[in-house]
Amino acid sequence: MADTSADTANALSAADRPEDDGWRQTHLGRLLGHSMRRFDERVLELMAHSPHAPLALANLAARAQVSAAHVHITRHLSLRGSRLVDLAHSAGMSKQAMGDLVGQCEAWGLVTRADDPRDGRARLVRFTPVGLDWLRAFRDAVAHAEAEFRAEVGIDVATVLMLGLEAYAGPTASA
């Protein structure tokens, strides 16, 4: 006879059965994920209303056409340009997914692809002048969202949290 979930639950000793599963809602990973989504949403909201963001891109952000995935390019693309595979790796995405994202950003005029002068077989993804304007508006939106965060939780908590996250993320966080 096959075990049912009720049989399995009954077979667990009292010590093995969590009496309170609230920990699943409040563990560090889940809180970090929710916090990151909230922060990214606020940055995109600020970008949508930024006088410094290129108008067409601000309109896309205002209509929720720009997502946190698009922010990956803004966060990870080197000012000197990046190979697609390196960009995907630093953003924690597959090369194919990053390729699709770069294609969309290229259509919006944020980035362009150019031959890599160090390797004729490779191509670099680079910011366009419009993309650099977007990057500056992104920098301003991040600074504004960070200031809001400090105001909400307090400067001391924000500082300790930032230092703790930098230590926890390790050296790859600033790479």
What do the PLM-derived regions correspond to, one by one?
Residues 1-65:
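N-terminal leader segment of winged-helix/HTH proteins
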